[in-house]
């Protein structure tokens, strides 16, 4: 059987950035990695209802900077920033260095693979029919400008005795094209019949220029200069 490489892993450094960006010597590397894992575990558990897409960790000069990408920044920040301050203290305690937490808003959650997968799992846990949940996610993504989307669910679908896999695709999802901006993520729905796995691939277009094009902000549109016609 043909196996697929992880769509995010194969594109790291080409069109996808890392979720942890720091350098460490051999002695500190394992501790930093363990600290990153614990910080992510804590934040994902604490912000389960805040629609968190991804958590980026940086370590500038004996400190830790955590950027939380979320579709609901108000829930993360809390009243007058109280909730985010509590998170900052716990993260600093886990990492053992001063912590800073930044919040980045996800403008279009329908085009974020993690948020789409979480949305489908929450619907499956509320006993919504899996085909309806899949179709709704695909339609919303295509309506908001996705070039292609594929959704796959696996498990005891509809309470069936034998587990199976079903998928639904619309548009293009070119997994072999390295410059293709493909957002991939997974989630799990814990139902009364067992666990149902959800996978989502979203193709947003091709990125020309590699990581340099990803990291550079889009230039602001400049007004066109009107040319004066001279007399002949």
Swiss-Prot record:
CDD domains: KH-II_30S_S3. It holds the Pfam family Ribosomal_S3_C. It comes from the Bacteria. The keyword Ribosomal protein applies. InterPro entries: KH_dom, KH_dom-like_a/b, KH_dom_type_2, KH_sf_prok-type, Ribosomal_S3_C_sf, Ribosomal_uS3_bac-typ, Ribosomal_uS3_C, Ribosomal_uS3_CS. SUPFAM superfamilies: Prokaryotic type KH domain (KH-domain type II) (SSF54814), Ribosomal protein S3 C-terminal domain (SSF54821). GO terms for biological process: translation. GO terms for cellular component: cytosolic small ribosomal subunit. Keywords: Ribonucleoprotein, Ribosomal protein, RNA-binding, rRNA-binding. The keyword rRNA-binding applies. Residues 39-107 form the KH type-2 domain. PANTHER family: 30S/40S RIBOSOMAL PROTEIN S3, SMALL RIBOSOMAL SUBUNIT PROTEIN US3C. Belongs to the universal ribosomal protein uS3 family. Part of the 30S ribosomal subunit. Forms a tight complex with proteins S10 and S14. Binds the lower part of the 30S subunit head. Binds mRNA in the 70S ribosome, positioning it for translation. This is Small ribosomal subunit protein uS3. It comes from Serratia proteamaculans (strain 568). The gene is rpsC.
